[in-house]
């Protein structure tokens, strides 16, 4: 992984505008790092014009560099269109893990009393997505069938990364699949979670069935949690967890490919929101999630890069705590004004830290 190079994956509409704001935080005069930022235009027009060739080029560059920051993109509905760039990127970099983290934003009232961060670590491949489906007539009735597949290597990647993340953040690994009903299929993930727990004996581990995981989320709100999950379980769970914190503005999404040692080899970060076409060009959209995505990405670099990521993350949350907020969080700051303030605070933090 080349921590001095971040592949920039441009997107659509307000998603692209927010990416540009996040990139301002990565300038040398802000974080003191000379980063290479090769750019690839993954807007819908570019993907159509190149028949997705630009996406394949971006995937190759991402795989070589190891770090990528992606704007939100439009996925057209037609089956004969270019489809989702995320699917191509995921397949070509070998991404097996998706991590989405919900966290409290100062001054924003969460739902149900959740407090500490919750990270959902889900399979990026297999399961219900990509399953083979068909229907057959059965007398006067009709039957539907589906054949799903998950692999032990992917279960191991999800479990191991979940425990690594919990170890790094002081969280508890919580939850699990419905292995009592499906001991062969869903039990595969449970076996790998148990094995990862043995490799990380200092990480608190509380296995739960997936239905109990949903039910117990609010009552376990005092502890930071990491929840490894199957593909569809995690997709649904993250759609619940992120809004529980009152806003998804404090959440980023990471696609991760692991090496043979089960360590991150390639990481692509993006905001956990869409292209917000109605906000395009108005300078009112909240850039926080995109800025935090960039900060999270820096956390996979060397020590100096990690420090820059921490400074950006703290500056972002402290700005909100001091009342500098965009309209969606009840404030009056515009997109550029908020980013300006995060830049000022980030530079100030890094200057102070360098003197300690």
Map each language-model feature to its residues.
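N-terminal glycine-rich phosphate/adenylate-binding segment common to multiple enzyme folds
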Residues: 47-145, 232, 236
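Glycine-rich phosphate/diphosphate-binding loop of Rossmann-like nucleotide-binding domains
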Residues: 7-30, 140-210, 223
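Glycine-rich phosphate/nucleotide-binding loop
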Residues: 46-47, 218-323
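Active-site rim loops that border cofactor/substrate pockets in soluble metabolic enzymes
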Residues: 41-46, 185-227, 231-239, 271
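Glycine-rich phosphate/pyrophosphate-binding loop and the adjoining helix
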Residues: 131-174, 179-183, 304-356
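N-terminal beta-loop-helix "entrance" segment that forms/cooperates
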Residues: 33-56, 217
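Buried hydrophobic positions in well-ordered alpha/beta secondary-structure cores of metabolic enzymes
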Residues: 12-15, 66, 121, 162, ...
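Short glycine-rich or small-residue beta-strand-to-loop segments that form or flank ligand, phosphate
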Residues: 5-14, 68-72, 172-179, 295-299, ...
